A protein has these predicted regions:
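Generic structural "secondary-structure junction" signal
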Residues: 20-29, 41, 76, 80, ...
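Gram-negative outer-membrane beta-barrel transporters
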Residues: 64-73, 92-186
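Extracellular loop and loop/strand-boundary signature of outer-membrane beta-barrel proteins
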Residues: 31-39, 87-93, 101-103, 134-145, ...
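Outer-membrane beta-barrel translocator domains and adjoining extracellular loop/strand segments
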Residues: 23-30, 77-85, 123, 127-137, ...
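Conserved C-terminal beta-signal and adjacent last beta-strands/turns
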Residues: 1, 8, 12-13, 40-48, ...
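Membrane-embedded beta-barrel scaffold of Gram-negative outer-membrane proteins
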Residues: 9-13, 41-100
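Signature of Gram-negative outer-membrane beta-barrel scaffolds
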Residues: 1-6, 20, 117, 132
Length: 254
């Protein structure tokens, strides 16, 4: 890490990591996930570089930003293999995978009252195995690894009112927007392009309101997730619940 000037710093890092398969990946669940006791640990060499900083122009304004890029060379990448017709899956190893990507984030704060934030991520994860074990060319070479979002972002906005109804109280209003680009459920090399299973693009908006008093000892929160009731899916194209409401009360005891 090196500080170039006060609002601008640079950070470069390298790491070698090993990820062992978890129990579900090795043994399955007995119904929808098949066991694969031959699953190998995942090894990766990771290179990261980022620019970041905080700027205080005055009058209670604060800006924070970070831009980063990364490259990961992964051996025995663990991923899910989906059997669409059977509705089952199994964790398998992809012998060689390269992950290239970039991320950006910006945050703004005004006197602890107004907070704005946005971020976007791009992750290009591709199969790098040119030939199969029998020497034949691999059809999935340079394909994106399926069932994995590769472009997504979010926007957040919060505003806090102080001393509403009670002294030493705070009322915070918040709204968030999340976006995910569509991606393939299975390898893009298999089947006709127009008929491939895809997880469609998703646009989800959430809203919440939190009221706290007695210096945060008592907290009451109300939240509405997906308040526009848009269709949403998880990584396996299983539909998530639509609009939902939640209420929560917290009491801190010293």
């Amino acid at each position: 890490r090196y500080i170039i000037v006060e609002p601008l710093s640079i950070k470069v890092s390298y790491e070698h990591s090993v990820r062992l398969p978890i129990a579900r990946e090795l043994l399955g669940n007995g119904t929808t996930i098949y066991a694969n006791v031959a699953l190998k640990p995942e090894n990766s060499n990771n290179f990261n570089a980022s620019l970041f900083g905080t700027w205080h122009p005055g009058n209670g304004h604060t800006f924070y930003y970070e831009m980063s890029g990364f490259f990961r060379k992964v051996d025995n990448y663990i991923q899910t293999s989906i059997a669409e017709k059977e509705g089952t899956m199994q964790y398998t190893n992809v012998p060689a995978v390269h992950v290239k990507g970039a991320e950006g984030e910006m945050r703004y704060d005004w006197q602890g009252r107004l907070q704005l934030a946005t971020n976007v991520s791009y992750q290009d994860t591709r199969d790098q195995q040119k030939y199969k074990g029998d020497g034949k060319p691999s059809a999935t070479y340079n394909n994106r690894v399926p069932n994995r979002p590769w472009l997504f972002g979010s926007v957040e906005a919060y505003y806090t009112f102080r001393n509403i109804a009670l002294p030493e109280s705070r009322l915070r209003l918040g709204c968030t927007y999340q976006w995910v680009h569509w991606y393939f459920l299975t390898w893009e090399a298999y089947g006709a392009y127009d008929n491939k299973a895809r997880i469609p693009a998703q646009h989800i908006c959430n809203a919440d309101i939190t009221y706290s008093w007695r210096r945060g000892r008592y907290n009451l929160a109300l939240e509405c997730t997906n308040f526009l009731d848009k269709t949403a899916y998880d990584n396996y194209k299983l539909q998530k619940p639509g609009r939902a409401f939640f209420a929560k009360f917290r009491l801190f005891i010293n």
